[in-house]
């Protein structure tokens, strides 16, 4: 890794000066195997981050690598965190945007690691100024919001069983993981459709379809009368021509997910009219760049979706803060804490069925306790 070039240094001790950074691995079982077209997880192998400021304020962040999607592993994140954390000691948390840009220069291929530090910095800064994190982004849309629920790739019977359980809790928008077998994917959606009235589907291919397979999938869902409201990343990330063709030939809106891992990627998708939505995920880009991508998306007249990897309410709370702070997020895919067997976080936003409920305390409003294998940088 290259060394960060210092563009500013805090000349005197300030109340928001970073004095200590701690991080530790957390293993959280996933209730049902999280199977997507590119791989499967049964345990969320994440990292929690805590930053302490000179005035004693503490902020929390989370790194949630998903190797099958982003290429990062927990080990690579831990290595990157050790290197980047040392560069933040003595800096002002209020300079989070500048520090995020410097970290992106130094570790461009480790966004999940950077995201953990960015989130903790921003959380600490918001707590020190006594504002909820969503207020930092404008506080323009503070209200309860509905999320979808994810059904992983599974047998037909398991898919129906999972969907019925979530339906009973109030979920009506089902994000179906697809992309392994077109015929089986169609059968799974059809079985869920006939089991539950008044539902809609997102088909999330995770790059698993070819153009022809995706067209066949959309046609098959239309044939049985399913409400397919979105096709998320149906083909490989660089195949923007197919994304454009799928939009045109199916009439179903398309969301770019893996295709957008940077602001430059977002501009390419926009220029080629390859998507109707861009899916904002802080683990793909870090928090500050996610905000820039969201702003560029809205300015270009596209719509916003927000999602995540397999995250707890720390990272997901940061993403929800963008929804509450900025206008324009139409589709929320902020469900992964519900897929975990335990919740290691106290406070913050909450779930009421399919509704996410805002919080009004400072920062993310959450706390959690360090576990074993604690690393401290000061």
What residues fall within each predicted segment?
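Surface-exposed amphipathic alpha-helical tracts and adjacent flexible/coil segments at the periphery
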Residues: 3, 313-314, 321
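Short helix/strand-capping turn motifs
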Residues: 327-336
């Amino acid at each position: 890794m290259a060394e960060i070039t210092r563009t500013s240094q805090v000349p005197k001790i300030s109340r928001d000066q970073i004095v200590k950074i701690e991080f530790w691995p957390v293993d959280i079982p996933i209730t049902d195997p999280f199977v997507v077209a590119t791989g499967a997880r049964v345990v969320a192998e994440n990292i929690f981050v805590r930053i302490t400021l000179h005035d004693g304020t503490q902020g929390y962040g989370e790194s949630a690598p998903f190797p099958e999607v982003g290429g990062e592993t927990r080990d690579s994140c831990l290595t990157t965190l050790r290197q980047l954390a040392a560069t933040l000691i003595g800096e002002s948390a209020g300079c989070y945007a500048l520090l995020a840009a410097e970290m992106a220069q130094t570790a461009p291929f480790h966004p999940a690691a950077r995201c953990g530090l960015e989130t903790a910095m921003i959380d600490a800064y918001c707590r020190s100024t006594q504002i909820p994190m969503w207020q930092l982004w404008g506080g323009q849309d503070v209200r309860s919001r509905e999320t979808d629920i994810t059904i992983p790739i599974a047998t037909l019977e398991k898919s129906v069983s999972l969907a019925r359980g979530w339906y009973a809790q109030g979920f009506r928008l089902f994000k179906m993981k697809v992309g392994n077998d077109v015929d089986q994917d169609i059968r799974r959606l059809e079985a869920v459709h006939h089991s539950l009235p008044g539902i809609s589907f997102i088909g999330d291919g995770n790059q698993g379809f070819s153009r022809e397979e995706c067209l066949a999938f959309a046609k098959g869902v239309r044939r049985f009368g399913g409400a397919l409201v979105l096709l998320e990343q149906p083909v490989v990330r660089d195949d923007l021509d197919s994304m454009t063709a799928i939009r045109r030939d199916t009439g179903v809106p398309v969301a770019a997910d893996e295709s957008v891992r940077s602001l430059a990627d977002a501009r390419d998708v926009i220029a080629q009219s390859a998507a109707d939505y861009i899916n904002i995920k802080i683990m793909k880009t870090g928090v500050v760049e996610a905000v820039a991508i969201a702003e560029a998306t809205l300015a270009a007249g596209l719509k916003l979706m927000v999602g995540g990897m397999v995250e707890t309410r720390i990272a997901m709370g940061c993403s929800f803060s963008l929804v509450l702070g900025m206008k324009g997020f139409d589709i929320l895919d902020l469900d992964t804490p519900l897929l975990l067997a335990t919740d290691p976080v106290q406070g913050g936003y909450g779930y009421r069925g399919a509704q996410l409920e805002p919080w009004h305390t400072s920062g993310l409003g959450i706390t959690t306790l360090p576990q074993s294998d604690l690393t401290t940088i000061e």
